[in-house]
């Protein structure tokens, strides 16, 4: 056995020279690109500023962290959570019928193509653009963030739903066709019972994404904790930045733990 391995290894083409040449070329390109790096207008007290930032972040403002008013971290985190949660739910509800009319194994291909083009168009536009558009329509606030999260969720959730539907065993659908079942009956009695776990897992995953996106959308005034975060950074109140970041970390860890528990239960059936 060892002789066969050695013989096969000896007969293998020697590519080390090409690999060495490729590594040399990449190293030369990196060195050449490094010559273009310029530090423009460095501040004389840059290290002191960096120290103040780190010190403020690691010494968060207890007043902001534990205040229960509308300016406190708990309220802002709750608002961010609600924007992400409701946006995910609304997006999933809209995605469900949209995915059914876009699955080529359920509807005629021209109809499925129209649905896929619509989903692709929704997914093309970034969340920031949607946020700015809805802020112009509804004004700054959580409702603009909710609409943005809902629309952004439709693109991804619909795509994942369609993939799950089209991965179904074709023999099951063919047997239902032979039995004279309508499309609605296929969805009601076969697709939904089989794919509930997959759909739920997709919704949970999208909620995790929306929770982070809702924070970023706050930077453009679409509600949530993002706006106070950018205001504190602009005013150099680093202890408030630390309090907000600490609250976000705790919220994300809690959501991750709950999501993991739900996924385990779904996997076990």
Identify the meaning behind each predicted range:
Residues 201, 242-269:
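C-terminal transmembrane helix and the adjacent membrane-cytosol boundary/short C-terminal tail
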Residues 136, 212-248, 267-269:
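Glycine-rich helix-loop "coupling/hinge" segments at transmembrane-helix boundaries
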Residues 119-153:
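Generic hydrophobic transmembrane alpha-helix motif, especially the helices
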Residues 74-82, 115-122, 204, 208, ...:
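Alpha-helical membrane-interface segments at transmembrane helix boundaries
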Residues 1-89, 101:
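N-terminal, non-cleaved signal-anchor transmembrane helix
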Residues 84, 88-96, 100, 104, ...:
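Hydrophobic positions within alpha-helical transmembrane segments of bacterial inner-membrane proteins
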Residues 98-131, 160:
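Cytoplasmic-entry segments and transmembrane alpha-helices of multi-pass inner-membrane transporters
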Residues 140-191, 197-206, 257:
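Membrane-cytosol interface at the C-terminal ends of specific transmembrane alpha-helices
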